[in-house]
């Protein structure tokens, strides 16, 4: 429960002192304390510009300015893996904690919510 600005001093996302040749992250969560709880690459023409992007679910803890979960990001990772653009999905639901995202064989996206015990099917508009 350490404030993010303090925690980063002790727990950098990539420790370049210990691992100077490590690949730097293409994206980070802006210092927020939200655990990534599952991700999947989106497959299927029905997703249009999102096909091939990474869907990531979060389980935020709601302290030090960090929102609770109920968030899915769609990451467009560059071909060289050195950068990414983020698009946040807006959910017309309660504040839950998304625990996992998954695709079925038809390319439908499913999201598991810890608070409600529900699994939501997400389809493109």
Predicted regions and their residues:
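Beta-rich catalytic cores
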Residues: 35, 97, 115
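Beta-propeller domain segments
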Residues: 1-87, 106, 122-125
């Amino acid at each position: 429960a350490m404030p993010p600005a303090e925690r980063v001093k002790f727990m950098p996302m990539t420790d370049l002192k210990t691992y100077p040749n490590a690949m730097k992250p293409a994206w980070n969560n802006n210092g927020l304390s939200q655990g990534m709880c599952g991700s999947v690459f989106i497959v299927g023409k029905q997703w249009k510009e999102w096909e091939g992007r990474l869907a990531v679910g979060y389980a935020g803890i709601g302290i030090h300015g960090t929102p609770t979960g109920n968030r899915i990001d769609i990451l467009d990772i560059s071909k060289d893996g050195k950068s990414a653009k983020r698009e946040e999905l807006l959910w017309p639901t309660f504040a839950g904690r998304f625990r996992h995202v998954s695709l079925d064989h038809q390319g439908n996206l499913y999201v598991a919510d810890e608070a409600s015990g529900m699994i939501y099917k997400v389809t493109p508009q």
